[in-house]
């Protein structure tokens, strides 16, 4: 039986850059890679033990000790602060314009709550984006999208109360395993395709699809999160002209398509481009376009001519899928005619699309110890920075009307 990650992946560039890779600097205080990959006959990985690391084991069924600390939240739940009946325990991630905390109620229910500073939102001209995310999560419910339960505000802050997803994001999974085998990644990628198919059917473009915004629930089902940069109102395979309808260059540089960077106009295919980047990253441990700063990354993407150097262990079918998703011409890009043409690609041969969420199909099964277990998230000192509107100094009183309609409570 082949062990997970028994090959030597390409060396990852660990130089500090203007746009940090979350693999470069990591605080290891609160993450345990208690991974349980289940893909047909793939051996299960048990709770970390005493002797071997993830990258240097010979017996895939033996206990594994993580080099990372095993610190956990105590049962006493140290409280950082509280508001509106929610007790905030610890930060678990950062989004495009807010920080996400694990919180508990008096009835012992756990939630992930995004805390957003009103003044920062106004200063970054992100009020519209905030309301777009709120409206998407209120209007659309699907197993591929994180659930929203409540939105409320105080004098200085906005809060979005969402389901707590125990399994951590794909970035944390990569931090633990470095790379995934294609057979391990296939179901994960299929779930992402299904998620994109749903949001595109609703006329939504995510615009910031990346491994940090793909989070596993406790069963191993992927949820798409962080719709702050999303755009709505796309029908069919329409292309929006960036110069006329939206001249903002938004997203995370590593995942941005050439047409977004050049503001030529864009459509749903920018998400399929991002999927191509994500697949490359899942299989190799790094994104295909890297640089010491944002401009260098943009230059590599805009000068890209449909040729990438692939690691030798990539299969021909995986290379073909990635190349077709990273087609420079958005109208020729795989997915331009809808998700069905992506699903028909030979990479997905053998995938039963009606059963990709069944327990026997899921390849990543978190081993959750309790309802407040957040150990699958690793803390990032630096994250991949997003590109958004420039912040302006704004010390004027916050105008309440700007956030009218934000409040929401699910029945």
UniProtKB/Swiss-Prot annotation:
It comes from Dictyostelium discoideum. The active site is at residue 208. This is Probable serine/threonine-protein kinase DDB_G0280717. The keyword Metal-binding does not apply. Belongs to the protein kinase superfamily. AGC Ser/Thr protein kinase family. The keyword Transmembrane does not apply. Residues 349-411 form the AGC-kinase C-terminal domain. It holds the Pfam family Pkinase.
């Amino acid at each position: 039986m082949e062990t997970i990650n028994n090959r030597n992946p390409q060396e990852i560039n660990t130089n500090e850059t203007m746009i940090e890779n979350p693999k470069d600097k990591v605080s290891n205080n609160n993450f345990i890679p208690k991974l349980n990959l289940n893909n047909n006959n793939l051996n299960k990985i048990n709770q970390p033990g005493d002797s071997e690391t993830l990258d240097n084991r010979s017996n895939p069924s033996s206990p594994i000790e993580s080099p990372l600390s095993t610190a956990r939240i105590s049962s006493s739940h140290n409280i950082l602060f509280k508001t509106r009946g929610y007790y905030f325990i610890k930060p678990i991630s950062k989004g495009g314009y807010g920080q996400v905390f694990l919180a508990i109620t008096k009835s012992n229910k756990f939630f992930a709550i995004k805390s957003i500073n009103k003044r920062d939102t106004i200063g970054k001209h992100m009020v519209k984006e905030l309301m777009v995310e709120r409206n998407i999560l209120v209007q659309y419910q699907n197993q591929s999208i994180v659930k929203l339960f409540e939105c409320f505000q105080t004098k200085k802050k906005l809060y979005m109360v969402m389901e707590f997803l125990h399994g951590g994001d794909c970035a944390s999974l990569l931090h633990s395993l470095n790379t995934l085998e294609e057979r391990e990644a296939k179901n994960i990628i299929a779930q992402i395709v299904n998620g994109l198919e749903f949001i595109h059917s609703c006329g939504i473009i995510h615009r910031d699809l990346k491994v940090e915004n793909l989070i596993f629930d406790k069963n191993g089902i992927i949820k798409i999160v962080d719709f702050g940069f999303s755009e709505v109102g796309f029908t069919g395979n329409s292309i929006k002209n960036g110069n006329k309808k939206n001249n903002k260059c938004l997203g995370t540089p590593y995942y941005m398509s050439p047409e977004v960077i050049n503001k030529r106009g864009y459509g749903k295919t920018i998400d399929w481009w991002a999927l191509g980047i994500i697949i490359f990253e899942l299989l190799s441990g790094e994104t295909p376009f890297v640089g010491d700063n944002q401009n260098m990354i943009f230059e590599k993407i805009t000068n890209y001519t449909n040729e990438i150097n692939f690691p030798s262990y990539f299969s021909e079918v995986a290379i073909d899928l990635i190349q077709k998703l990273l087609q420079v011409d958005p109208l020729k890009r795989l997915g331009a005619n809808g998700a069905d043409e992506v699903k028909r690609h030979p990479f997905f041969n053998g995938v039963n699309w009606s059963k990709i969420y069944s327990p026997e199909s899921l390849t990543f099964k978190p081993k959750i110890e309790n309802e407040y277990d957040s150990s699958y998230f690793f803390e990032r000192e630096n994250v991949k920075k997003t590109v958004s509107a420039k912040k302006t100094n704004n010390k004027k009183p916050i105008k309440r009307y700007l956030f009218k309609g934000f409040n929401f409570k699910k029945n």
